[in-house]
Amino acid sequence: MNRIKAVGYENNELKEKAQLLADQLNLQLDQNADTCLFVTPEKLTLKIRNFSLMFADFSAMTWSKRRGEGKKQGLIRACKPTKGIKIFDATAGWGKDAAILATFGADVLMLERHPVMAALLADALSRRNEADIQKMCLSLIASDAISFLHSLQEKDYPDIIYIDPMHPERNKSALVKKEMQVLQQLIGTDYDAMELIKLSLSHVKSRVVVKWPQKVKPLLPPDASIDGKTVRFDIYMPQFSSN
């Protein structure tokens, strides 16, 4: 499964909605496809052979349960998300790290360049109720992070840019979750990760945080690192930062 080529739908009442999405993403409409973006009455999902339906979820109920344990996570220790802090998640993926950061009060903008993943994230955002929106400040721009940063004015620089590049080593472990397996196959390796890190350092106020496999050499020597069991969080400080 290298790429999604079709949009499917659960029943004929959803055909028009599926067709609109297929046209938007330049995909085929195929109700019988076994690998596709799949429209159900409740949500947009990813249908992959031998997997259950997968979808993004930004309900406050789901993520508030993880907030307590999140305080001990390297992600939180590295990014230090608090109310009023502006964070760009430059490689949003399924949006899970972005959601965790948002539960701590940060204003998180997700950037996702893969159209299929961006569609899944957008659908998850659209399903939120008012309580979800109040508790988690999340937004999305379907864009390549490098292009987006190039277009950014200095007054709009975020406090933190978080980067979780797709790395081949991440897919070799039997412990890799199904969502990461699918993301790896769908997106592939982020070969422009070095370029993104360097560009981020000139477009951020406080720090750049990179999630990277624990035993793999960093792309750039970090100013600090927070180690986990299988990954670490490398921290890079821009030269002009006062933090």
UniProtKB/Swiss-Prot annotation:
**Mind listing the GO molecular function terms for this protein?**
rRNA (guanine-N2-)-methyltransferase activity
Give the domain of life. Answer: Bacteria
Q: Where is the protein localized? A: Cytoplasm
The EC number(s) given in the record are: 2.1.1.242
InterPro entries this protein is in? 16SrRNA_methylTrfase_J (IPR007536), SAM-dependent_MTases_sf (IPR029063)
| Record-listed S-adenosyl-L-methionine binding positions | 112-113, 164
Q: What does this protein do?
A: Specifically methylates the guanosine in position 1516 of 16S rRNA.
**Record's HAMAP family?**
16SrRNA_methyltr_J
What name goes with this protein? Ribosomal RNA small subunit methyltransferase J
> Lineage from the top down?
Bacteria, Pseudomonadati, Pseudomonadota, Gammaproteobacteria, Legionellales
